[in-house]
């Protein structure tokens, strides 16, 4: 937004230079992108009066003028403008003047043989826009000759190009910037009074019909008659030009002026043209969404094809304007306008943004509506415009209609609880006082300057009432703290070193998962990642209601299916057996609702050894025990003891070669060989083994002090005493159960138990097998004697006979 310092000085007392003011605004978050110092544009240009004009003797298009600039002698100036004539007041660039906009230094010269002692200037030569070819002629009479033209042309001004952040819609107006400058510099604020607009008594002049009160919560329509359309006074035109707005006519310029001053968009309709569009004398102004297929020719001359996303202003249901964006060409104010309807309205920011984007049209009005217009200043801006129209266009206000569904004005402000301790905690040390902390009076002074009202709520606490024009961006305590920091100045904060940082660390679960991944990779397994979405078809699957693809429309219930398919695909591609694992989430549904948990699964198969020369170039598939050994090695690296029990619940696994895994009495998962039928269906080798574990159960088992922080246990320096024990045991009794019983019976001296032989066949009773274990006894403080070992070993033998009914062979 372009800010005129001359205009700003009327609203707030400014004693700073333009550069100092620009620095303060930039430090407060309003970046000043450019400082346009117009005072240099017409330095040395004075008011002159053309006394006489004669044609140039040697050129048809040139004139020789005698110009009085208040000096002792008149100047002889050659001019090529077609509109130069005698007895007019003009800007004259005297000898020595420099015009930076055309890069010209005025020197005495001869033009076609006639001496010229200056130049009569046009507005373009002075850097100002102009729609008239030729020199500029002052409309005023009896101007002091030789006086500086800059105050007359608005060239005694400095323009700041200020960018407001997206959350500061209130700063898109001169009043908003004035409030900000007053708060930053502790200067006196002089907000312009809107004036009183007298509405004469009349009935039936205008009706309102708001179809969507959410999109248009407030609408004021005012009928004004006896309007005289003319050019705006010079002061108004100068202010519009300084803001980059082209003056058009007094009424249109007033609506643009109020937009710049208060940030409230307004629009003026020609009343007679509205009646023509509506084809009726009684008008009803409406606000509704467009119907598909409707069109509207806007003020830029473009015909817009409308959709239901566009919000319209209508006259008796006929489109006349894009609400909050741009008016229609059919109803614009023109030179012959004598009566008009002034629109002042509040439109929803989302509705305007959607409407603006759908037609690819942005305007000053839509930009402000999209950011949010202050609902408390609608009437002020409307009265200001009506007062100026009455003053500058002789308009008579004959009727006014208001449709207002805004909430009660008491809700236009909010109260926020603010704590002084929290302010200093967030901001840290500041260059203020001896303590380096803000005091209560500092906070009160800063927020009061912003227009907030503070009510003490205790020692160092306040209830802060936010003004309506800051309602949209001051919502929480942290917003108020930011305002305190911004107004106090970010450059006033102390330079402090950050506190000593602690070394970063991962949560225990993540550390354990990383340790688990490392253990699996150490065993030669590759980590795989599959989609969580799979084909539907299982009973317990959770199916998506709106999938992108039918093939990926259900959540996976386990990880094994994806691993088996990946193993098959790699074989088909000639890549050999894929030994891998995956950590991921699985999902299923039960009667009590949807369930999910993390799991880890793996697949092992084929010949894992390198080189076949020692095996006669033949594959040597993994046995069940070798595959189990890989998993056991992982558990050993993790420092946990897992028990195996026979299991045959999973139909995809071999019923006689499947075990469930248990840890601490909790089911950990399953391990087994693929079922022969599944192996044949997928054309897989015979020795393919899979496992799937409950990751939560595994992490709970690992999350123990003795595992997370291993304790040193000294090795015994004394020799061990070995004992072997062999017996016939029922096949239904697992080795793990037997080992558990042996460890319990030999507790104290027993160091380890190892199965070293299993035999089934001749000389073994039906339904039994021969098992042989090696038991190692050792003490940490002495060499064990036979008299110490034998009682313990006999206790083990007795426990096996008593618990399992084994037939001892040794």
Swiss-Prot record:
It catalyses: tRNA(Phe) + L-phenylalanine + ATP = L-phenylalanyl-tRNA(Phe) + AMP + diphosphate + H(+). Its cofactor is Mg(2+). Residues 39-150 form the tRNA-binding domain. Transmembrane segments: none annotated. Mg(2+) binds at residues 473, 479, 482-483. GO terms for cellular component: phenylalanine-tRNA ligase complex. Residues 411-495 form the B5 domain. Its EC number is 6.1.1.20. Pfam families: B3_4, B5, FDX-ACB, tRNA_bind, tRNA_synthFbeta. Binds 2 magnesium ions per tetramer. One of its GO terms (biological process) is phenylalanyl-tRNA aminoacylation. Residues 716-809 form the FDX-ACB domain. The keyword Nucleotide-binding applies. GO terms for molecular function: ATP binding; magnesium ion binding; phenylalanine-tRNA ligase activity; tRNA binding. It is an enzyme of class 6 (ligase). The keyword Ribosomal protein does not apply. Gene3D superfamilies: 3.30.56.10, Bira Bifunctional Protein, Domain 2, Ferrodoxin-fold anticodon-binding domain, Nucleic acid-binding proteins, Phenylalanyl-trna Synthetase, Chain B, domain 3. It is found in: Cytoplasm. Keywords: Aminoacyl-tRNA synthetase, ATP-binding, Cytoplasm, Ligase, Magnesium, Metal-binding, Nucleotide-binding, Protein biosynthesis, RNA-binding, tRNA-binding. Belongs to the phenylalanyl-tRNA synthetase beta subunit family. Type 1 subfamily. PANTHER family: PHENYLALANINE--TRNA LIGASE BETA SUBUNIT (PTHR10947:SF0), PHENYLALANYL-TRNA SYNTHETASE BETA CHAIN AND LEUCINE-RICH REPEAT-CONTAINING PROTEIN 47 (PTHR10947). Tetramer of two alpha and two beta subunits. This is Phenylalanine--tRNA ligase beta subunit. It comes from Trichormus variabilis (strain ATCC 29413 / PCC 7937). The gene is pheT.
């Amino acid at each position: 937004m372009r800010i005129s310092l001359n205009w700003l000085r009327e609203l707030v007392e400014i004693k700073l230079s333009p550069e100092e003011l620009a620095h303060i605004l930039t430090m407060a978050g309003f970046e000043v992108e450019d400082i346009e110092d117009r005072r240099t544009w017409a330095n040395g240009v004075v008011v002159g009066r053309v006394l006489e004009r004669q044609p140039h003797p040697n050129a048809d298009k040139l004139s020789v003028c005698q110009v009085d600039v208040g000096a002792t002698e008149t100047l002889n100036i050659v001019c090529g403008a077609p509109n130069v004539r005698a007895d007019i007041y003009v800007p004259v660039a005297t000898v020595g003047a420099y015009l930076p906009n055309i890069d010209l230094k005025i020197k005495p010269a001869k033009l076609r043989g006639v001496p010229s002692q200056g130049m009569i200037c046009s507005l373009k030569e002075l850097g100002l826009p102009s729609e008239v070819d030729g020199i500029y002629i002052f409309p005023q009479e009896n101007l002091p000759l030789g006086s500086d033209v800059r105050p007359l042309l608005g060239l005694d001004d400095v323009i700041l190009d200020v960018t407001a952040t997206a959350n500061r819609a209130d700063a898109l107006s001169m009043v908003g910037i004035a409030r900000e400058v007053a708060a930053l510099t502790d200067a006196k604020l002089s907000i312009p009074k809107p004036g009183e607009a007298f509405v004469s008594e009349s009935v039936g002049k205008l009706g309102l019909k708001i179809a969507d009160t959410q999109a248009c919560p407030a609408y004021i329509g005012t009928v004004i008659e006896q309007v005289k359309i003319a050019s705006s006074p010079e002061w108004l035109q100068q202010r519009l030009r300084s803001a980059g707005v082209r003056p058009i006519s007094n009424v249109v310029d007033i609506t643009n002026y109020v937009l710049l001053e208060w940030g409230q968009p307004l629009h003026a309709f020609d009343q007679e043209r509205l009646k023509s569009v509506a084809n009726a004398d009684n008008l009803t102004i409406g606000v509704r969404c467009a119907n598909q297929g409707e069109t509207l020719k806007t003020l830029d001359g473009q015909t817009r094809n409308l959709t239901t996303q566009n919000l319209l202003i209508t006259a008796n249901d006929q489109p006349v304007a894009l609400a909050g964006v741009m008016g229609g060409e059919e109803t614009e104010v023109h030179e012959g306008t004598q009566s008009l309807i002034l629109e002042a309205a509040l439109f929803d920011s989302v509705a305007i943004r959607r409407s603006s984007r759908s037609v690819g049209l942005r305007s000053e009005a839509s930009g402000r509506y999209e950011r949010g217009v202050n609902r408390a200043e609608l009437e002020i801006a409307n009265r200001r415009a009506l007062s100026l129209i009455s003053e500058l266009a002789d308009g008579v206000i004959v009727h006014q209609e208001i449709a207002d569904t805004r909430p009660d004005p008491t809700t236009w402000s909010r109260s926020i609880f603010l704590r002084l301790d929290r302010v200093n905690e967030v901001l840290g040390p500041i260059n203020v006082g001896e303590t380096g902390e803000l005091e209560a009076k500092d906070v009160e002074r800063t927020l009061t300057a912003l227009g907030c009202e503070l009510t003490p709520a205790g020692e160092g606490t306040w209830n802060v009432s936010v003004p309506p024009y800051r309602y949209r961006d001051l919502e929480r305590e942290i917003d108020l703290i930011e305002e305190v920091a911004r107004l106090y100045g970010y450059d006033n904060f102390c330079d402090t070193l950050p506190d000593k940082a602690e070394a970063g660390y991962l949560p225990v679960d993540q550390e354990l998962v990383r340790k688990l991944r490392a253990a699996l990779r150490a065993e030669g397994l590759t980590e795989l990642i599959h989609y969580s979405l799979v084909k539907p078809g299982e009973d317990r699957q959770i199916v998506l209601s709106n999938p992108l693809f039918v093939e990926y429309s259900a959540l996976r219930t386990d990880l094994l299916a994806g691993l088996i398919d990946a193993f098959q695909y790699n074989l088909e591609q000639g890549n050999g057996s894929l030994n891998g694992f995956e950590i991921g989430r699985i999902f299923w549904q039960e009667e009590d609702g949807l369930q999910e948990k993390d799991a880890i699964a793996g697949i092992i198969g084929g010949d894992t050894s390198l080189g076949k020369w020692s095996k006669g170039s033949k594959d040597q598939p993994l046995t069940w025990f070798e595959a189990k050994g890989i998993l056991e090695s992982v558990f050993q690296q993790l420092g946990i003891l897992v028990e195996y029990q026979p299991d045959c619940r999973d139909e995809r696994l071999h019923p006689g070669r499947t075990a469930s895994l248990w840890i601490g009495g909790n089911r950990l998962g399953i391990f087994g060989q693929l079922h022969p039928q599944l192996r044949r269906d997928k054309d897989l080798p015979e020795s393919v083994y899979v496992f799937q574990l409950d990751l939560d159960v595994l992490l709970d088992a690992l999350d123990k002090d003795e595992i997370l922080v291993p304790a040193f246990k000294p090795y015994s320096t004394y020799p061990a005493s070995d004992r072997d024990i062999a017996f016939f045991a029922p096949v239904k009794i697992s080795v793990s159960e037997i080992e558990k019983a042996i460890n319990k019976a030999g507790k104290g001296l027993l160091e380890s138990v190892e199965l070293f032989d299993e035999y089934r066949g001749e000389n073994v009773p039906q339904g039994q097998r021969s098992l042989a274990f090696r038991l190692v006894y050792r003490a940490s403080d002495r060499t064990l004697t036979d008299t110490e070992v034998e009682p313990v070993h006999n206790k083990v033998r007795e426990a096996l006979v008593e618990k399992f009914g084994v037939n001892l062979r040794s």
